């Protein structure tokens, strides 16, 4: 099988794989065009009876002009007995293809991914092989980050955390030592500042002085009108008068307290119970009814 055209790009770079178009490789509305650019390729051929050796030789032949460093092919079996192949390919330089059929083996099409963690991907391919095939030597990719530089940055950050005494000082020190990170990750640094220097717990202070809420503008009015209201039944039990007389006396008290009738010189009720309650309006009446005492 002749190889399909590919283009090669030099230099380091992370690979990118996207959705493979359906319908014979034609891009349909809503789908993205296939593109692969990487040094490390991870392939999975589901339900593929081809042997690892045959598959490996075909892939190696297809990549013979691409400076291929290493190929590893393993075969595993599903629980239903169907075989599938895993293939890991390492190239010397980045290569790019826009053909979703580039790694097809006869009629078997693989799932194609750029292996962003080459060593872990190779280890995954080697986990439970029934058989395998190998070509070349795997070269562990170089880590771009300098260990010395990373250790120095960690040391600087530890010093900032140890020496800062407030949120503002912490953020100021971070901004001075790591200006770029401060600009693009300010929200994360603010979060860590809040964690390092939390607000002191606030002591609860009741908004109203009285424990019974009688000084509350709404609850206090409700207490006076509802909770401290004496029923005719309660008054008749205490004063030894009929319930009807108690109702008359309570109505008189209501008129007295709500309209200021006493100041206008209206004649008072002669009921003994009424005369007592006249001096016990509000919370005192509730205490009187509860304790049964007029003293």
Curated annotation (Swiss-Prot):
Keyword check for Magnesium: no
Domain CRESS-DNA virus Rep endonuclease per the UniProt entry, residue ranges: 35-138
Entry GO MF terms: DNA binding; endodeoxyribonuclease activity, producing 5'-phosphomonoesters; metal ion binding; nucleotide binding; nucleotidyltransferase activity; structural molecule activity
Catalytic EC class: hydrolase
Positions of short motif RCR-1: 42-45
Subcellular location: Host nucleus; Host cytoplasm
Primary location class: host cell
Protein known as: Replication-associated protein A
């Amino acid at each position: 099988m002749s190889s399909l055209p590919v283009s090669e790009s030099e230099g380091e770079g992370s690979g990118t794989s996207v959705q493979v178009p359906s319908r014979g490789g034609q891009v349909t509305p809503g789908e993205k065009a296939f593109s692969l650019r990487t040094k490390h390729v991870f392939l999975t051929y589901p339900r593929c009876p081809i042997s690892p050796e045959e598959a490996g030789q075909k892939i190696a032949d297809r990549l013979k002009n691409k400076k291929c460093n290493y190929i590893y092919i393993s075969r595993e079996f599903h629980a239903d007995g169907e075989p599938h192949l895993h293939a890991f390919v390492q190239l010397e330089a980045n290569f790019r293809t826009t053909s979703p059929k580039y790694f097809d083996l006869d009629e078997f099409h693989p799932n194609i991914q750029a292996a962003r963690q080459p060593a872990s991907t190779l280890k995954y391919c080697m986990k439970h092989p029934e058989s395998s095939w190998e070509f070349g030597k795997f070269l562990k990719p170089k880590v771009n980050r300098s260990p010395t530089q990373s250790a120095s940055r960690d040391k600087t950050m530890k010093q900032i955390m140890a020496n800062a005494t407030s949120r503002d000082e912490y953020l100021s020190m971070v901004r001075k030592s790591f200006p770029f990170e401060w600009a693009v990750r300010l929200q994360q640094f603010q979060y860590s500042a809040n964690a390092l220097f939390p607000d002191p717990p606030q002591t609860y202070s009741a908004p109203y002085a009285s424990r019974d809420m009688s000084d509350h503008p709404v609850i206090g009015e409700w207490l006076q009108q509802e909770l401290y209201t004496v029923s005719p039944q309660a008054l008749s039990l205490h004063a030894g008068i009929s319930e009807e007389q108690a109702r008359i006396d309570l109505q008189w008290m209501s008129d007295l307290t709500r309209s200021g009738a006493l100041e206008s010189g209206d004649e008072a009720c002669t009921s003994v119970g009424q005369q007592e309650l006249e001096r016990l309006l509000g919370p005192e009446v509730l205490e009187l009814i509860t304790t049964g005492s007029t003293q």
